[in-house]
Amino acid sequence: MIHNLFSTLPTFKNLGDLKPGLNVLLAQKTEGSTSKQTRNRAGKTSFIEAIHFLTGSEAGPDSIFRTPELAEYTFGMDFDLKDARTVVERSGSAKAKIYVTTPPAAKRKLSATDWVTFLGEEMFGLSSLEAAGSKPPSFRSLFAYFVRRQMSGAFTTPEKQATMQGTGDMQMALMFLFGLDWQIARDWQAVRDREKTLEELRQR
């Protein structure tokens, strides 16, 4: 579970009172709010984006964490990773460097790629599958089902974690998460890819 979400940004609303079980994040209007004032900018979407940022998302040029107002500040998350309490920290100005602390060990620096690989093994056993010669779904593809982004259209259809998610990726991810033989979905996608290539060759 997530114990705390924090930042060196002075105005950041630290979430340090999360409890085991279901936690609901709400934005509450004040007594003086009018019917035209919404709950936007209360931090609900930023909470989701921060989790993705701290679990190794790409953080491209359009990322909120790379804006001039936020790039120099560090964001962090204290959470349980398997049976170890773990703290991860990252900033937009140095997005390729991720700092991880698992007490009593000292803080260590990882690349974003290595961090994603580590999370993939710890949460889903992906590295072990790759070592055995398989090509499992990616960590980002699987993790996005648990932390859904509204901006990606993740709530449009339950079987997809993003509007643009391909059929093969969706099928393989879901079969993996349900404990089914996900390699069947991978083989289906290989057939679709071959059929697409043949169709393109016919049209030449």
Regions found by a protein language model. Name each.
Residues M1-A84:
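Extreme N-terminal "head/tail" segments of very large remodeling/mechanoenzyme assemblies
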Residues G76-V100:
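Gly/Lys-enriched N-terminal cap/neck module of very large, oligomeric protein machines
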Residues G92-E200:
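Extended, charged alpha-helical "arm/stalk" segments used for dimerization and assembly
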